[in-house]
Amino acid sequence: MWRTNEDPRVGQAGNPDRGAARADRTRRAQHPGDRFGDTPTVSIPSRLRPIAHVYDAAYAGVPNWDIGRPQRAFVRSLEAGLVRSPVLDVGCGTGELSLFLARHGHEVLGIDLSPLAIRQATEKARWRRIAAQFLVWDALDLSGLRERGFTFRTVVDSAMFHIFSDAERDRFVAGLADVIPSGGLYCVLGDARRDERSAYGISPRELRQRFGRAGGWEIIFAFETIFERQWSRNPAFFVGVRRR
């Protein structure tokens, strides 16, 4: 467990501060990478630096997947009472989902491999006076978070798992078991995988099989939805997996 010293501002579910989000995007487009505070001091392993640099380059502009607000599936999960603190947001990017959940009273830690994205998320939290925390961290090293004393009753994943390779997915699932105690929930949104031979995307069938092999998990919901991007709306699945 962990706490912050700031009190989050609580607003209405489903109505994030869109004006603030638009201002964030405008400022980032005009001054990419030079208007943000210090990045948390966590060293990125040398093997991951090329990947981090790729995402830094994306976040120097405004990536297509950064729509300035949380995806609707996560808004509805909050309204349904599925989110319990503390919350881990894996692959948090510039922090819109983390900030949304924190603004509604949850303790949230957002992690991402991109130092620039984390700097932007940290600045958003400071500017909006929202008590969310952010850390440069590899989501495939969740056991390292456990070693630092972190556990989470909810892990949210807005389009990170769907880019992983088969081996990375197994490693990530193993890491989830390290940080989610019995009764905890993993909620994942990703582009729909229509062909089970494809390496990209997610499907309820694949998740049921993968978490079933790992043992100790159960799918509690799975439905079709939309993953919104700035210039498109892609078919997606939203799946909840509970730790037994």
Question: Where are the language model's segments positioned?
Answer:
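A short SAM/SAH-binding and catalytic strip from SAM-dependent methyltransferases
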Residues: 153-167
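A short acidic, Gly/Pro-enriched loop at the edge of an enzyme's catalytic core
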Residues: 145-155
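Class I (Rossmann-like) S-adenosyl-L-methionine-dependent methyltransferase catalytic domain
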Residues: 2-3, 18, 22-28, 33-88, ...
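Short polybasic linear motifs
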Residues: 14
